[in-house]
């Protein structure tokens, strides 16, 4: 009742989409408690880890990061807080980690409020599908092997099993080379062979969706900028 009466509440965590929110949901469910973020009060979830990764990717000067032995940037909460001037007093304790998360989130918002708010554009997961379906093509981000990168994609379809999952075609590949004159067996083999031809957008995990003309996309020189906007539009 306390959270329900508050109305529009953002439940924030660090790596929450991969751990905290899942653990909390399972714990609440197993003990027959209600889900405070599932009430129809515009409550929602956000996660500062992917937000920090996205913001550092498009604005590399916004965060100082430590480097590990593999020469990868470290995005652990305690490390980011220490590197940027607000160290966590007692790391891995509930109170101090919460204060660290608060400080980091406020730091990101203060230093680039425009990009910060852009990352929160789809905090309501129901807004993602109609938005991407109405775009010729768009850019989204993914992080794997400790590196964040952008992908130019066009909408393909909704996932047949996982609600809220959107399948998008990666436009670094020419669809003519994949779809023309192929049997179903050949097509299936090509689509699921590496490199991956499709990207999965999870609507409930606060995806960043950018239009091709937005300044953040324009600031990145990559394989898509080499292909060029005209060719990407043809492929879409």
What are these model-derived regions, one by one?
Residues 1-30, 74, 82-83, 181-236:
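Conserved non-catalytic scaffold segment of RNase H-like nuclease domains
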Residues 3-114, 119-122:
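Metal-dependent phosphoesterase core characteristic of DEDDh/y 3'-5' exonuclease domains
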Residues 14, 33, 57-58, 107, ...:
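Sequence-level detector for tyrosine residue identity
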Residues 44-47, 93, 170, 174, ...:
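Poly-acidic low-complexity segments
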Residues 62-80, 139-164, 214-230:
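A broadly tuned preference for mixed-charge, low-complexity surface segments
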Residues 110-112, 121, 125, 230-236:
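Polar helix-capping/helix-linker motif
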Residues 121-201:
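Acidic catalytic cores of enzymes that act on phosphate-bearing nucleotides/polynucleotides
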């Amino acid at each position: 009742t306390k959270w329900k009466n508050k109305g529009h509440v953002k439940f924030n965590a660090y790596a929450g989409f991969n751990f905290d929110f899942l653990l909390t949901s399972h714990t609440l469910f197993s003990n027959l408690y209600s889900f405070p973020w599932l009430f129809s009060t515009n409550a929602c979830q956000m996660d500062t880890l992917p937000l920090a990764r996205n913001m550092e990717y498009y604005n590399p000067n916004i965060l100082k990061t430590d480097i590990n032995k593999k020469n990868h940037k470290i995005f652990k909460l305690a490390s980011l807080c220490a590197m940027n001037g607000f160290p966590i007093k007692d790391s891995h304790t509930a109170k101090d980690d919460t204060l660290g998360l608060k400080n980091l989130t406020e730091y990101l918002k203060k230093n680039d409020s425009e990009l910060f708010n852009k990352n929160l554009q789809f905090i309501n997961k129901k807004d993602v599908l109609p938005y991407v379906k109405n775009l010729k093509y768009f850019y989204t981000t993914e992080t794997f092997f400790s590196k964040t990168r952008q992908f130019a994609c066009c909408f393909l379809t909704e996932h047949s099993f996982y609600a809220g999952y959107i399948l998008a075609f990666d436009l670094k590949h020419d669809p003519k080379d994949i779809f023309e004159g192929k049997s179903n067996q050949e097509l299936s083999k090509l689509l699921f062979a590496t490199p991956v031809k499709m990207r999965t957008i999870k609507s409930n995990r606060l995806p960043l969706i950018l239009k091709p003309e937005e300044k953040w996309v324009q600031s990145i020189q990559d394989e898509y900028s080499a292909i060029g906007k005209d060719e990407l539009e043809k492929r879409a």
